[in-house]
Regions:
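Non-catalytic terminal extensions of PLP-dependent enzymes
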Residues: 1-34, 38, 42-44, 49-50, ...
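Generic structural signal for well-ordered, non-membrane alpha-helical segments
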Residues: 25, 29-33, 64-68, 102, ...
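Predominant activation on well-ordered alpha-helical scaffold segments within soluble catalytic domains
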Residues: 33-41, 69-76, 110, 163-166, ...
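Surface-exposed helix-capping loop/turn segments at secondary-structure junctions
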Residues: 42-52, 81-86, 293-302
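Short Gly/Ser/Thr- and Asp/Glu-enriched loop/turn motifs at secondary-structure junctions
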Residues: 53-55, 94, 303-309, 353-355
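Conserved PLP-enzyme active-site core in the AAT-like
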Residues: 59-249
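Hydrophobic, well-ordered secondary-structure elements that form the walls
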Residues: 179, 206, 282, 333, ...
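Active-site C-terminal subdomain of aminotransferase-like
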Residues: 192, 196-322
Length: 470
């Protein structure tokens, strides 16, 4: 991996003076983007005789969030163009076209719905993290601008029922996007994966990050579309001002070419064989971790993930005194030199709960440290086994008394101002400065989970804002 890092640094440095705003001024930018899009098109089965009438084309973006935003914006614009009367009727009724996803879809799609004036319509998942295809398909109607399925979902590592949903979307004339930002450069070489990409005719667009399992530096992703018309709807163009004609394929205007150049160099160096080898390393690590977790009492893997991500949860089939709480486990792992990611549980729109968990992303680097990691995992589990879920009783009592948390389910609550939010965070153990988080995050995660979502979001906004505030 060090060799790839050095290659990325050298390529990025060579492209540092270039501006991706205008590839006609810097033809090398167009050449590199063309090569990357071509590589991804081949990888995701976007070539072949069946695609001649609707060729797969696309763009390089600044990251997964931008790819997801553009996928939603494109689908919305096409829906408006194809359903003008329905769009006007919904507007008169104070309604908006819908964006259908599962509750485990990446948060970027919530952001997209908010930015592009769509109604986010999340479909609840089962407790094991799966989303029944019938449940998603039942939400599809003529007011749906886009349905999104994930390969895989980030929180659980589980692949959505893409074949069934995309087929239904195609029958109904609805755009279907596959968010493969996480798995787009791992699943093509992962063992025993059912088709999820452009082999499925109902898939109209796919996002895939090159800065994850493409091993490029941060800031480069790809959005592919089935058909030129769909791709061109992604663009912004105007001649209605006194300056130069503006044509932006993505949300950004000026763009650094360094991430593009680094990604181009790495895809050229690795090729399909190199990616297959690195993916095999990830798969071996996942197999060993899965086997190790199965031997740790009180701990289990959430659902049945496919790919280089998985989440650990308490094995609640055992008595409570044998449970290994994943957030206590994550805190304890820090003492052993490893960081795994706390994920709070959540209540879905139908009232069903999704468990709190600890997320693991497995990379080729994992295999080198796997013996130490597995030993640390076992020791950390032994240390916290039977420890009850972290509480935030004092903080919750204070917030309830002040009106920032409801006294009953569905009750009213107030929103904290920035100063009050910061005071609450200080009480919860957050410190000023860049090293702001408390040593153990389990209590803070409990607080985040049990507060009304708008209040928790206000607290987290304040935390991040204070980190960089002068």
């Amino acid at each position: 991996m060090e060799e790839l890092d050095e290659l990325a640094r050298e390529a990025g440095e060579l492209a540092r003076p270039l501006n991706g705003l205008d590839p006609t001024t810097f033809p090398s930018i167009a050449a590199m983007e063309r090569d990357i899009v071509g590589f991804m098109r081949r990888t995701l089965h976007g070539t072949g005789s069946g695609l001649l009438r609707s060729p797969v084309v696309g763009s390089v973006t600044s990251g997964g969030t931008e790819s997801c935003l553009l996928a939603v914006k494109t689908a919305r614009d096409l829906w408006r163009a194809e359903h003008p009367e329905l769009a006007r009727r919904l507007a008169r009724e104070g309604r908006r076209p819908r964006l259908v996803t599962t509750t485990l879809v990446h948060a970027a799609f919530q952001k997209a719905a908010k930015l592009f004036d769509l109604e986010w319509d999340p479909v609840p998942c089962e407790p094991d993290g799966t989303a029944p295809a019938s449940r998603i398909v039942d939400r599809l109607d003529d007011d749906v601008a886009l349905v999104v399925v994930s390969a895989p979902t980030y929180p659980s590592g589980i692949i959505d029922p893409i074949a069934e949903v995309s087929a239904a979307a195609r029958r109904l004339g609805i755009s279907c996007h596959v968010d493969a930002c996480f798995g787009g450069l791992a699943l093509p070489w992962w063992p025993r994966v059912e088709p999820w990409d452009f082999r499925l005719r109902g898939v109209t667009s796919i996002s895939a990050d090159l800065h994850k399992f493409g091993y490029a530096p941060k800031g480069v992703s790809v959005l592919l579309h089935r058909g030129r018309r769909r791709h061109r709807a992604q663009f912004f163009a105007t001649t209605s001002w006194a300056g130069y004609p503006v044509v932006n394929p993505t949300l950004l205007g000026s763009r650094s070419a360094s991430p593009l150049a680094s990604a181009w160099a790495i895809t050229k160096r690795l090729g399909h064989e190199g990616y297959a080898s690195l993916t095999s390393s990830c798969a071996r690590s996942v197999t060993q971790i899965t086997q190790a977790v199965a031997s740790i009492p009180g701990l289990t893997i959430w659902g049945n993930p496919t790919g280089p991500a998985l989440a650990l949860i308490a094995d609640e089939s055992l008595p409570a005194h044998e449970w290994v709480d994943p957030h206590h486990l994550a805190d304890e792992m820090v003492r052993h030199g490893f960081r795994i990611q706390h994920q709070p549980g959540s209540t879905q729109p139908d009232g069903a709960r999704l468990p709190h968990s600890a997320h693991l992303t497995i990379t080729p680097v994992t295999e080198r440290a796997l013996p130490e990691f597995l030993a640390a995992l076992e020791q950390a589990a032994d240390a916290v086994r039977g420890t009850p879920r972290a509480e935030a009783r004092l903080e919750l009592a204070a917030l309830t008394a002040l009106g920032f948390a409801p006294r009953s389910v569905g009750g009213r609550f107030r929103m904290p101002s920035p100063s009050v939010a910061w005071l609450i965070l200080r009480v919860a153990g957050v410190n000023p400065g860049a090293d702001s988080l408390p040593g153990r995050l389990a209590p803070l995660m409990t607080l985040v989970e049990r507060l009304p979502a708008p209040v928790a979001e206000a607290l987290l906004t304040e935390l991040l804002a204070r980190v960089s505030e002068p």
